[in-house]
Amino acid sequence: VAGATAVAATLAVGLGAPSLDTAQAAAGRNDVPSAVPAAFTPGVNNGQVRAIAQVGSTMVVGGTFSSVSASGSTAVINRTRVFAFDAGTGAISSFAPNVNGNVETVAAGPTAGTVYIGGSFTSVNGVKAPRIALLSLSNGQAVTTFKPGAGFNGIVQRIRTSGGRLFVGGSFTKYQSFKHVGLATLDPATGNNDPYMNLNMAGRHNDTGSGRVEKTGALDFDISGDGSQMAVIGNFRTVGTEARTQLALVSLGATSATVRTDFKTNDYEPLCYNSAFDTTVRKVMFAPSGSWFVVTATGGGNSSLCDAASRFETNASGQDLHPTWISHAGGDTLYGLAVTDEAVFLGGHQRWMNNQLGNDSPGPGAVPRPGLAAVAADTGLPLSWNPGRNPRGAGAYSLLATDAGIWVGSDTPWIGNHKYKRPRIAFFPYTGGYNLPSTAEPSLTGLRVGGQVSPGSSPVLYRVDAGGATVAANDGGPDWAADQSDPSPVRNSGSNSAGYAPVPNVDSTVPASTPSAIFDSERWDPSGGDEMAWSFPVAAGHSVKVRLYFANRCTCTSAEDSRQFNVAIDGNPVLSNFDIVKSATDQTGTMREFTVTSDGAVDIGFGHITENPLVNGIEIIDPSVPTVAATVTDAVTQTAYDGSTVGATTTVNGGGIDWSNTRGAFVIGGSLFYAKANGLLYRRTVSGTTYGPEVVLNPYHDPLWMNISNGSGGTYNGTDPNLAAQLPSLTGLFFDNSRIYYSTSGDPRLHYRSFNADSGIVYPIESFAPTSLDFSTVTSMTLNGGRLYYVRTDGQLWSVAFSNGAVSGTPSLVDNPAVSGHSWTGRSLFAAPNQ
């Protein structure tokens, strides 16, 4: 999070319509630029590039530098804090004003060949110009008709033209003799005060009385493409008469600007590291449509919007609004920002992105993105584009999107890992880039089953990993079901879960086929409230074996007699004053087995004696059922189905995929995505029965950045997401609206995460979809045409409506194998790819 406060670039294209910082997709251009920077750009020899703008065919750059050089040349050309060059060739122009302070913002002037500059300077070419000036690009001299007079009494951070007005933001309290705290409007031609903007800012974000102190004012603002909305960020707690902390949305009316009373977020209230930062926001920009905007921030930590980019919807209404998505760096500042229709480009000194679970280190799901990143506009997940900047310096302060490509201004000389020398300014052209993949589903002509399963039999009725995630079975039987939901269909509420490192020991009571991982989590019952109770439906009259697994993992009860509790099954005591440590020693897994005859349900109850009862695993076995191993093949079958009529089944080419080890698949945009039991996702192009080569989706370990020093005591290596541990237990997988949905063995919930089809990156944190369907009965599933098709444990194919991320309506039977003879049981169910 360290680094100087900076403001990213402005781009102004004249008066009337607002100047644009966003780039709409030009006809024929790619969605994402090349990761190789153009070679023609000039070099900035020192300092920082703070602002970039395009004025006609000329690029204007502002910052803190004192000299530049032509591309490939070491000859020094003196340029004081601002210079210009040809946008197509990089040729440095004769524009060379002498500015006595930093230039923070640049924007096209009101007439061709003129440019506004703003910053901390007080003179240009030795002539008084308090923090704002309009210059001629031909000679660098001030345009004499623009007369700011006494100008601003504080730093100008942002200049923007819209609707025949010049909007100015910064840390000032007046313009000339007029009171303007943070925001002002001027006549763009004369510099006269325009009373249109009469919203004064007050207060500071860090109002604790200690820590960092910065001036009140606007750090950045942007105006929507239709000129109706302004998003402004900075160090303030009120704008006009409205309480707003660091972010406000302003309605730009015909005669005055007013703070929108229906748009308020409290998510920028957290102080984060206020010893280092007063305000934490850094840059704001609208999408080309004006329907949403993004804010970048510094500040430290992941419990808030600090060190993250956040998307907000312009038409949202409420007094406690939250972002649509948050893209975390995980402890590193994000500065520069450029927004296009397809992507959000981010500059800073970040080491990783997708790092919601990390703080100054790569958490699960983190991917290397040194100093530059592009994230998807709809989810905030990183795209594949990953040129990087190593070393990262303090940051990439200034990003600018044009129809030709993405400009990046920073304080470092290299793009890539010391690969392309582009001192402090680089250009990534759309030529040589790529288009984002389609996510359209195939038209439904048939359903394919990959990894045909001939069911075996198992005496196991239930297995539960108490308090933990799904644990794969070691014996071919059912997996140990996750116990992480509350309420649970087999347990009452009020208990807690805990997790531990792998258990060091298990005793001889534990069957060899039982995975020791079940002892790495527990469910324990605190005192007060109802005692912990479990209930498992079992046909009345059946004699079953109940196995209860225990381990004392908490160091707080490592001594004998420090934890004792009772256990009863169907109301009959089976363990009294049970002491795990006395029975099996500390940090050791043990098992107790009891034979009972069911009365329709097996009820297990726990009772307090000393400390809290706990259980690590529960297994219920019907010894009358023989163990017969299931068989799985790599065969793929296709059954004709158009959404209404089930036709014939044929065996089709499976592309050489090891389908027996898949755990779900889906087809979108001409690609087959599938999960394997090894914890990885894969992709192949597919057309009918023709498959491309297998590509492993492992963006968390980009070979370009593996084991490369990040300059902060570590490397850029990312970390696998926790989804990897779930994939072996998947029972179904499908894609919808930039998300993957999945079910896991023994779990009634429908899980989901955001997913990017370009990069293969998944969101680090999972969520759960509303559903009336019990997904513990699902063995495979796919989505097509708004219908979720799923195979139940009895082999029947059913469907149910699925829209807006939720199951709805009543399920209907599609096909009963007992009648039709079709086989739907397999590792993966997916819609047949179109040719």
Where do the PLM segments sit?
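N-terminal export and membrane-targeting signals
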Residues: 1-8
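Extracytoplasmic surface signature
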Residues: 13-454, 630-650, 657, 663, ...
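Compositionally biased, intrinsically disordered or flexible polar/acidic segments
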Residues: 15, 450-628
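Well-ordered beta-strand scaffold positions
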Residues: 127, 469, 572, 670-671, ...
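Extracellular protease catalytic domains of secreted zymogens
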Residues: 316-335, 463, 487-498, 767
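A recurrent domain-boundary module in secreted/ectodomain proteins
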Residues: 421-441, 604, 609-626, 815-835
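Extracellular glycan/ECM-engagement signal in secreted proteins
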Residues: 776, 787-791, 796-800, 804-835
